[in-house]
Amino acid sequence: MRSLLILVLCFLPLAALGKVYGRCELAAAMKRLGLDNYRGYSLGNWVCAAKFESNFNTHATNRNTDGSTDYGILQINSRWWCNDGRTPGSKNLCNIPCSALLSSDITASVNCAKKIASGGNGMNAWVAWRNRCKGTDVHAWIRGCRL
């Protein structure tokens, strides 16, 4: 029993860091944070992007060949948008540590995503959105959700 308690206490901090959202749960959180129709992109676009970027996992990270890393539910890149302390020449245009993008609270990710989408490329900045969501019926991603 004591070893089980020690094991639980060791993994407890990891559980607090990230979260895998349900589709409708994420849609509701994104809507509450102002992403529905942000810069003309419907909520379904954002949910679709999150599905194919991170599979709705706030703790997702992916290392890129250029040495940068993508972080969080929308896989925001450390070369341009956040500071992870290890990406050479990082611009940190969202002025946040990349670790903030791994939280179960997606506020930092959404605020940074708004800055990214406000740039000249809009949601085209997300490769997964371009390849998997753009031009598709993205309303399907929020169908059946009570929003």
Curated annotation (Swiss-Prot):
Monomer. It is found in: Secreted. CDD domains: LYZ_C. It comes from the Eukaryota. SMART domains: LYZ1. GO terms for molecular function: glycosaminoglycan binding; identical protein binding; lysozyme activity. Residues 1-18 form the signal peptide. The gene is LYZ. Keywords: Antimicrobial, Bacteriolytic enzyme, Disulfide bond, Glycosidase, Hydrolase, Secreted, Signal. Pfam families: Lys. Transmembrane segments: none annotated. Residues 19-147 form the C-type lysozyme domain. One of its GO terms (biological process) is defense response to Gram-positive bacterium. The keyword Ribonucleoprotein does not apply. This is Lysozyme C. Disulfide bonds join 24-145, 48-133, 82-98, 94-112. Its EC number is 3.2.1.17. Its main location: secreted. Belongs to the glycosyl hydrolase 22 family. Lysozyme C is capable of both hydrolysis and transglycosylation; it also shows a slight esterase activity. It acts rapidly on both peptide-substituted and unsubstituted peptidoglycan, and slowly on chitin oligosaccharides. Lysozymes have primarily a bacteriolytic function; those in tissues and body fluids are associated with the monocyte-macrophage system and enhance the activity of immunoagents. It catalyses: Hydrolysis of (1->4)-beta-linkages between N-acetylmuramic acid and N-acetyl-D-glucosamine residues in a peptidoglycan and between N-acetyl-D-glucosamine residues in chitodextrins.
